[in-house]
Amino acid sequence: MLNGKSKERNVPEPKLIARMAGRREDKMTELTNTQALKEKLTEAGVKYAIASYVDIHGVTKGKFVPVAHLGQMMEGSELYTGAALDGVPQDISDDEVAAMPDPDGLAICPWNRQLAWFPGNLFLSGEPFEACSRNILRRQLSNAADMGYRFNLGIETEFFLFRDTEDGGFAPLSDRDNLGKPCYDPRTLMDNLPIMDELVDAMNELGWDVYSFDHEDANGQFETDFKYADALTMSDRLVFFRMMANEIARKHGAFASFMPKPFADRTGSGAHYNMSLADLKTGENLFEPRGDDLHNCGISKIAYHFTAGVLKHGAAISAVIAPTVNSYKRLVRQGSMSGSTWAPVFMCYGSNNRTNMIRIPGMGGRIECRAADIACNPYLGSALILAAGLEGIREGLDAGAPHHENMYNYSDAEIAEQGIEYLPRNLGEAVEAFEADPLAKEVFGDAMFSSFVEYKKGEWESYQNHVSSWEVDRYLKMF
């Protein structure tokens, strides 16, 4: 009673009551699921959960949380100061971001089963943090879903296994790994098998379905190939793979390197993106031709449009999928004792042609972006490629005629006559193209776009100001 009158209550409308009840049910379901997950992890011997996210490089970061506190972790209890990491656009005075773990990405660490890793999405003040790499990809996946597509992705993981040497350098583990053409050498693969076997077992334990692995074209270089997945899952797996490979290598007195090109006279490590779109409802591969293969390359009309979009934005994309100064030492015609770098140099496409930015493998039904290297942030790389491809579909872009020939054999004049553009020659050119491309800003959002440009310009400037041993050796006593 107030002033002799009954106080009126704000009675919710029936629809609001239903929504409130739905939220309570959802909350109860979440609690039940979290409790079940907690029990599952405890039974598996897990002591700590890692609420993870990535920096601008796609390197996993996180805190260790005792499983007893899993419930609060799943609700975003773990807060992070973004300013402490490379390329996360926050100031030291900004509020912390919260990592919301994705239980679908759970991986119990095979090298230490006391640990469980969760990829996470960053939130700020209860809303998705726009500059979170994983959120950037999720936005583009949502755009694809609105068009009726699921984006499938397979990434080939090329990397090096090295040991530290007494002189402070590094070398391949095997003393037999010294061939000029070491690709597919079973002897050196056997010498590295203790590491590779444990790594492949770990990948299969996680359900990745490894179907081959081999010694690659550089000394100490290896590749693992495993089944494709949706782009978010595959990006999570690449981030986890880099951590896992290093941890397993350390157990054997070695280290894994994901530097794109550690040797000037050897091939570099790619992370070729094998891509297709599937019908969201039926799962049908929409890149498989059904009477609409315009150039007899083994892909559909929609795949040609997708390819055209990627090529249109190829220079900007390069800044993201070849993100380091060292990346552009890989994207050259010559620079390997084996006779070829196997890396793309031109923004064009062709069937089963490894000299193009976009290759269409022999079986068709997918396209492969060969410019991507193993140092990429897969969330950002796949987000920008997907956005470019979707633009190509929406606008019906024409990819032009394919190039089946070895593009390395053409002179600069012949390349120009055909209207073919080079990929950026260095990180500076790539970042300039990224900054000038409106699609890059649209995909990344204002804050992450500005942060990426600023960080990469700084990286390029730092390299430009460095005096290398090559310069000293060449010029110190020349004049």
Pin down the residues of each PLM region.
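Histidine-centered divalent-metal-coordination microenvironment in nucleic-acid enzymes
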Residues: 158-170, 215, 219-229, 259-283
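Short, solvent-exposed loop/turn segments at the edges of secondary structure
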Residues: 113-115, 154, 217-219, 268-272, ...
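Alpha-helix capping and helix-loop boundary segments enriched in small/acidic/polar residues
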Residues: 186-190, 212, 229-236, 262-266, ...
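Catalytic-core signal marking the mid-to-C-terminal active-site face
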Residues: 247-250, 254-255, 278-479
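Gly/Pro-rich turn-and-neighbor structural signature
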Residues: 227, 234-240, 246-262
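A generic structural motif
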Residues: 55, 123-129, 188, 228-234, ...
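N-terminal amphipathic/basic-hydrophobic helices that include classical n-h-c signal peptides
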Residues: 1-27
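ATP/Mg2+-dependent ligation/transfer catalytic cores
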Residues: 16, 24-215, 234-237, 254, ...
